[in-house]
């Protein structure tokens, strides 16, 4: 492989890992984009499905919808998605 090709491959992989890390370490915006338009103001629109997710605050949320509802209430990036499953 030519040095230029190897360099481009290395840069591409670095960008991929950085973007994955950015979503897992913080920003709920991309993670919650599907829920922004569906959440009702009364907060009762989340299903009771048990598929836990862990927030960067160390709390386990019942599902993505419950996490996103809390994240949008707090806004300003104070709560991020850490990983699927219990904390």
Swiss-Prot record:
It comes from the Eukaryota. GO terms for biological process: negative regulation of proteolysis. GO terms for molecular function: serine-type endopeptidase inhibitor activity. Keywords: Disulfide bond, Protease inhibitor, Secreted, Serine protease inhibitor, Signal. Its main location: secreted. Inhibits trypsin. CDD domains: KAZAL_PSTI. The gene is Spink12. It holds the Pfam family Kazal_1. Expressed in epydiymis, in the caput. This is Serine protease inhibitor Kazal-type 12.
């Amino acid at each position: 492989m030519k040095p230029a090709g190897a360099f481009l491959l290395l840069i591409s992989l670095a960008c991929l890992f950085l973007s994955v890390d950015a979503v897992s370490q913080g920003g709920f915006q991309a993670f919650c984009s599907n829920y922004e338009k569906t959440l009702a103001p009364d907060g009762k629109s989340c299903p009771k499905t048990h598929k836990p997710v862990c927030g960067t605050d160390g709390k386990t949320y019942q599902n993505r919808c419950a996490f996103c509802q809390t994240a949008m209430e707090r806004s300003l990036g104070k709560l991020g998605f850490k990983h699927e499953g219990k904390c």
